[in-house]
């Protein structure tokens, strides 16, 4: 019989790595989603979200939503604190910073899961509606510790890589000076932050794919 290797997200990555490492093991490789990152913070995702995904009008609505979350931050923070307390969430950074990171995660999460832009509240909607939307799309569970994603996060900083965040859409309202290195600062304890990124896996896989599947 024929064998197929397939996966989505990290599974999609694994499908590529498996094919590149053991090219004759299976007959067909199908990666539904397979980010091939060249650094801890790859740098291409931010540009894609800002200029390519969806339509120009949709990107404008998403950007305005990010800014509205920041404009309402003072009023939404009590709700955010109550939510985090209720769920017993703990973070390596202050809650005020985690709120901003939820807003930065918002466009990636929205597009990643195919959330319709039409679900974004209107400017006339109340704070509870806006807060519910933020929690539905970019819930702070993603940034808490202990984190169920820690094994992956270690892999990400060592060889899988990840995506970064652009502060540009919310620069006017955030106290964050930079998001560089956020993965280590937010996702990992001090004892696991010392690793450097090794691009060997990325380079080997790209070389194989360009040769075998140009």
Regions found by a protein language model. Name each.
Residues 104-214:
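C-terminal subdomain of alpha/beta-hydrolase-fold enzymes, centered on the catalytic histidine
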């Amino acid at each position: 019989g024929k064998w197929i290797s397939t996966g989505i997200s990290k599974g999609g990555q694994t499908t590529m790595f498996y094919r590149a490492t053991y090219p004759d093991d299976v007959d067909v490789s199908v990666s539904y989603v397979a980010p091939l990152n060249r650094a801890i913070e790859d740098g291409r995702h931010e540009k894609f979200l800002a200029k390519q995904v969806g339509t120009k009008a949709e990107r404008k609505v998403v950007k305005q939503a990010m800014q509205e979350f920041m404009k309402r931050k003072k009023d939404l923070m009590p709700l955010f604190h109550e939510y985090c307390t209720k769920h017993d969430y703990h973070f390596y950074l202050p809650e005020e910073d985690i709120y901003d990171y939820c807003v930065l995660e918002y466009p990636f999460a929205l597009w990643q899961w195919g959330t319709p832009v039409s679900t974004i509240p209107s400017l006339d909607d109340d704070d509870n509606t806006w807060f519910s939307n933020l929690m539905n799309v970019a819930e702070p569970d993603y940034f808490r510790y202990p984190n169920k994603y820690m094994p992956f996060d270690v892999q990400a900083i060592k060889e899988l890589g990840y995506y970064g965040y652009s502060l540009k859409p919310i620069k006017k309202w955030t106290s964050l000076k930079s998001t560089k290195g956020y993965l280590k600062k937010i996702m990992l304890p001090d004892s696991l932050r010392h690793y450097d990124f090794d691009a060997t896996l990325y380079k080997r896989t790209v070389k194989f794919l360009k040769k075998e599947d140009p």
